[in-house]
Curated annotation (Swiss-Prot):
Partially overlaps YDL010W. GO terms for cellular component: membrane. The chain crosses the membrane at residues 20-40, 49-69, 86-106. Keywords: Membrane, Transmembrane, Transmembrane helix. It is a multi-pass membrane protein. It is found in: Membrane. This is Putative uncharacterized protein YDL011C.
Amino acid sequence: MADKLSSTDAMGCWSPTFCFISLISSSTSELPLFVVEVGIAAYSLEDPPAILSILVLNALEVSSFISTVKKFAFCATKNTNNNNSVVMLKILAFLLLEGIIIKLFLY
């Protein structure tokens, strides 16, 4: 797990798991630590929907959601020729979809 968290590709982009941790580390005061741990575990099991349900908790705050999307977009587009970027693009697509759903039903 430690290798997965700290690994970078040839272009120096972090692994999706590390990006996930860095995304929510800025808002850990808002989220219980166990939620962060569950998110990391979910990603380790390669279960993106479980991660997204956790990210949606953070996305309920619009400014935080926009920041999250921007960070995922940056990591996803930094190097489009590797598997990490493909995973990031998929998560970004789901985040955008979740953002639309949240906007439709909660605002």
